């Protein structure tokens, strides 16, 4: 092999490594402090939050403009659900994308208004089903309370 071919191969390898670390590689945070630092600056990172009853996986995808405001796009995935109804289990492994204001440190799933995707839709569906069941279970009581108001 000639020196020219070897140099071209070496340049391609270096370029490939640079592209990988720039656009694909996402460092993992092992603790909350690392995650909060990355979230505040919207630097690429992933973090698994074991909150006891539920395990969330977060992945910062980068900055984006949403409604002319700079936001940090975070992918949220529900990895495990240890408590709750059987219906809740259908949310496991679903994801949603959340637009967190730049510089704000918060759990993205706490403000679902800024999120979209199958996980958000599933959570909303569960809430509606639970509300519907509550109304069915208490229709007599609700009716008598409304009658007492008049």
Annotate each predicted stretch with a short phrase.
Residues 1-4:
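Positively charged n-region of N-terminal signal peptides that target proteins for export
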Residues 34-38, 42-44, 49-51, 79-82, ...:
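Extracellular/mature segments of secreted proteins
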Residues 110-150:
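C-terminal partner/receptor-binding element of secreted or periplasmic proteins
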Residues 7-21:
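Hydrophobic membrane-insertion alpha-helices, especially the h-region
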Residues 6-7, 35:
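Intrinsically disordered, low-complexity segments enriched in polar/charged residues with Gly/Pro
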Residues 18-76:
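N-terminal export/targeting and maturation segments
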Residues 55-109:
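Mature extracytoplasmic domains of secretory-pathway proteins
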